[in-house]
Amino acid sequence: MTAYLRWIALIAMCSAQLALHAVEPVKLQRLKVPAPPWPAGDERGMANQIGPATLQRCAWHVAEPGARTYELSQVRSNTMPLSPFAGPYVVKPKPSSGIPGTAHAFNSETLNEGAEPGQQGTQIDALGHFAVLKQPWDGKSPLPADEATYYGGFTQKDVKPTPDSPLQRLGLEKMPAIVTSAVLLDAKAYVGKGQVMKAGEVVTADHIRGMLKAQGLGERGILPGDVVYVYTGWGDQWRDPDTDKVYYSQAPGLAYDAARYLGERRIVAIGLDAPFIDPVPSGMLAGSAGPAPGTPAGLPFAVHHHMLTQMGIHHVENAKLDELARDKVWTSCTMILPARQKGAAGAEVRPVAIGAPEKLPRRSR
C-alpha cells in the first residue's frame, strides 16, 4: 500500500509540474490589470488592459530558455485565397526606377484599383468594422445605415457620417500596440480528434473549458488581457495558388456561447486559422444553408457582433497557427502590430508569438 501511495504521489507531482511548465509564475498571473467600465467615449475596448501587467507576463515568455519566434501570418500574394466580402488584392510590381544625377536605383509596387488589403490575408478588424441595425435588412430596400450603432453606443453619424468618409471613431489608429500573453487552444486535437474541424463545426464554451484542462491550463485559465488563438486545422485549406476555392467558401468557427465566455474573461483579441471567426456551414454564403445551430436570429455573424460591437474585442482572421500547435506552445508572448491607418476598419497584420516549445526543458521557478 505504501508503494502504491508513493506512486500516486509521484504521478500527482509530475502532473503538477507539467501544468507549471506551461504557464507563467502565479505572481505574474495575479498582477492586476485595468477593468471596465471604461470612461465615456472609450474607443479602445478591452485593449485598455494592455499595460505593465500584460507586458510582464509577455516578458517572462520572451526570457524562457529555448524561446523562439513563431510567425502567425500567411504569406501574401496575388494568388492567395481571397475574401468574397472585399475587393481583390493584386500587387503590381513597377519597373526599377532611378534618380537623375545619382547612382541610386529602387523598386516599388502599386495596388490595383478597388483593392482592400485590410480585409484580405491575415488581417485584424478595428472596432469600427462592425455595427448593428435595429432589425434585419431585407437586402432590397436601401440599407438603413443611419440606424447603425457601434461599440460604446456610437452612432453612424459619429463613426461614418458620409458614405465616403473614413471612420471618425473606432478606427484602427485608436488600437494600441497589442503586446501581451497569449493562449493557444488546440481545437483540431480536442474537438476534431486530430482531424481538421469541419465546415460549420463550432468550438463551444464547454470545449474551451475542456481544452484548458487537457492542455494543463486548468488552473491558469484565461487571464484578463490575454489574446486567445484557436487552432482548428482549417488553415490546412489555405493553398497558394488557390485553385480549389475551398478556404473562403465555408469554415469552422466559434460558437456564440464561446464568444460570450471569452468576452466575460476580458480577452483583448481572438484569432483563428480560419477566415471568419464565426462558423460558416457549406452553402451559407450562397444562401442555400442557414448559420450554425445556436446562432441568434438575424445575426449569422454573431461572434463578430458580440466581440466587436458589444465587448470591444479585436479579431485576427486567417492566422497561421500550425507550427505553434505542433510545438505545443500553449502560452506565449504575442505581438500584434497593424499599420496605423487613420480611419481604417481593418489592416494587414503580421502577428508573432514568442514562446518555448513544450518539448524543451523549462527553467525552474
Regions found by a protein language model. Give the residues of each.
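Bacterial N-terminal signal peptides that target proteins for export
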Residues: 1-8
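Active-/binding-site microenvironments in catalytic and ligand-binding cores
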Residues: 23-365
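Hydrophobic h-region of N-terminal signal peptides that target proteins for export
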Residues: 11-21
